[in-house]
Amino acid sequence: MKKEEKNQVVEALADQLTNNNNFYIADISELNAEDTSALRRLCFKREVTLTVVKNTLLKKAMEQTDKDLEALYDILKGPTSIMFAEAGNAPAKLIKEFRKTSERPILKGAYIEEMTYIGDEQLDF
């Protein structure tokens, strides 16, 4: 990916982070193609946007927002996906429902209405 392309991705992510008060960071690695497709279909039905992102680009985008997202920097390791939704609990419900049949996705962290949550155990907040 060229530098211009990376800058465009960072700008787009920064816009999404700025314009959404709710987003979840999850690990969907180790899902096979069938499960990944099922997860994406479920996200589409529930009006949740799911995007796989590079950690370095996501961190740069986070730094460009006026939100306090520093607590989320440490979770940006390994495979990362970001989920955006209007309703603060929509991604959490989706993750819980999907995990009835699969071990993933695993919640890494979330930003909901100016509150930061870290770790999979926060799924029931």
What would you call each of these model-derived segments?
Residues M1-Y111, M115:
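Positively charged, polar, low-complexity stretches
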Residues Y117-F125:
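Phosphate-binding/catalytic loops
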